[in-house]
């Protein structure tokens, strides 16, 4: 049938037109048929790429139309949404054919680009339809913790610093496929990145990290604030930082004034 054909029970009539041929007389034959409407999804949102943190809500919408009948909106039909193949809800289409759903991203949701499936199972006179989109990027906060520093280094000496960085569900930093994400912790002392050198700082399985910091020979004695920071190189983690304090010692010398040596 052509676009614009109304779905439902129809009568198909085949007719040989009278006097259309000198060899045949006119006749006709009728047969009952049922025309199913063809459906599709339009106006899917979000259309453009968005980033959503775990624990936050994301709004999704689509419009169910009858493509075989001039794309008329279909109201009152159930549409199911699936997040990475897992159903998250079934909602009816409104008067304009839109199916709107709000989904709270669980903290167990895998990170990265997520495929969302939109499904209409069909009805007694409408064929089913499905569509999918991959415009939602799931992201996690990170929490960085520094262990207490008990060392009291002298200028020119080395001390150790350690801690842990985790995602918002307590796991270490992982790739989308669940493998370890290569990452480093960066440091500054008293707001400066000079006066010391760092070795290590690699994030390991479970988010644990440690580093050795070598102070320069002229590093001043006193109380210091050290900051550890994670700056992500991927778009499915947010960065984080933390600070703690430690004391350093300097050198002293005694000069003889009297008697002169």
What are these regions (language model features)?
Residues 9-12, 64-87, 114, 167-196:
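Short flexible loop/turn segments that cap and initiate beta-strands
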